[in-house]
């Protein structure tokens, strides 16, 4: 039986502002497909990205490049959860499996604003997935990323087994003489880290939200933002922690519910908007319609709710 060549999908997009509204140019190759873009509040280009192959197998590669011009605003999401199929032990020629790889490169110019919000990544048993996210931006630009991964199809009683998930996030601020690091975040989950109390402790869902803010945050702003994020954990299950960056915020979720991770990150997302005087985000049309993560949540820049006592 003839083996199929792995996919290498590429997507390169440029965003420019015209009369207060951001437009995109560029294109992609299979298995990527761009859906119709919406114009959100403040002229933001909201663009869903579709992976038409129905899932990723060992050896597949995805490359995404996003370039934002001055004053442009964009929200990039995916149409559905991304599946990564098992690789380890599936081939006699390659019993150790082959890694599926995804690289995302984001380059932001002055006062631009990018929100990278893909839907959930689901690793099947024995899947190998490695991702890199590289961001460069000036001090007056904003970058927000929220990513959620489920390690094994737990509803079917499946675990990750011999699979592994690797992630490398690097954010650099453009400097007058040389760039400076905002964040370098390298993670690997698999083997003992899945059940170790210093790892996931048996939780199958992990998520990270990172915000590189477009301005230095005062001590009061950081205090209010962190207090609000902790308050937003109320009614949700899992271990949720957050802390400040030099100029921004990082939040982590570990638990059993991708829904609760999505709800918490959506509420923090709304707070980052409010802090900049922007409107509350509209949930992308391709996200689950039955969910309303922002319902009943106050998102004001000067609110100081009581922090949750759990987790």
UniProtKB/Swiss-Prot annotation:
GO cellular-component term (any): cytoplasm
InterPro entries, per database record: UreD
Spans traversing the lipid bilayer: none
Protein name: Urease accessory protein UreD
Keywords: Chaperone, Cytoplasm, Nickel insertion
Keyword set includes 4Fe-4S: no
Function summary: Required for maturation of urease via the functional incorporation of the urease nickel metallocenter.
Molecular function GO terms recorded: nickel cation binding
Entry superkingdom: Bacteria
Family: Belongs to the UreD family.
Origin species: Parasynechococcus marenigrum (strain WH8102)
């Amino acid at each position: 039986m003839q083996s199929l060549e792995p996919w290498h999908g590429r997507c390169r997009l440029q965003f420019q502002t015209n009369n207060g509204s951001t437009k995109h140019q560029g294109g992609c190759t299979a298995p990527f497909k761009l859906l119709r873009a919406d114009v959100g509040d403040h002229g933001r280009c909201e663009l869903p990205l579709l992976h038409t192959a129905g899932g990723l197998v060992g050896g597949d590669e995805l490359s995404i490049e996003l370039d934002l011009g001055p004053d442009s605003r964009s929200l990039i999401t995916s149409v559905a959860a991304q599946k990564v199929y098992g690789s380890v032990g599936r081939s006699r020629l390659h019993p150790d499996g082959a890694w599926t790889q995804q690289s995302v490169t984001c380059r932001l110019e002055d006062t631009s604003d990018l929100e990278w919000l893909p839907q959930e990544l689901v690793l099947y048993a024995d899947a190998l997935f490695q991702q890199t996210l590289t961001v460069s931006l000036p001090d007056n630009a904003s970058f927000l990323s929220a990513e959620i991964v489920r390690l094994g199809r737990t509803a079917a009683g499946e675990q990750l087994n011999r699979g592994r998930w690797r992630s490398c996030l690097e954010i650099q601020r453009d400097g007058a003489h040389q760039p400076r690091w905002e964040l370098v975040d390298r993670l690997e989950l698999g083997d003992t880290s899945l059940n170790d109390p210093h790892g996931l402790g048996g939780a199958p869902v992990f998520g990270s939200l990172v915000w590189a803010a477009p301005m230095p945050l005062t001590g009061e702003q950081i205090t209010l933002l962190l207090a609000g994020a902790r308050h937003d954990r109320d009614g949700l299950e899992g271990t949720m922690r957050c802390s400040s960056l030099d100029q921004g915020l990082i939040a982590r979720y570990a638990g059993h519910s991708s829904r609760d991770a999505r709800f918490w990150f959506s509420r923090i997302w709304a707070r980052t908007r409010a802090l900049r005087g922007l409107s509350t985000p509209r949930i992308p049309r391709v996200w689950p319609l039955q969910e309303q993560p922002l319902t009943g949540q106050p998102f004001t820049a000067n609110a100081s709710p009581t922090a949750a006592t759990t987790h």
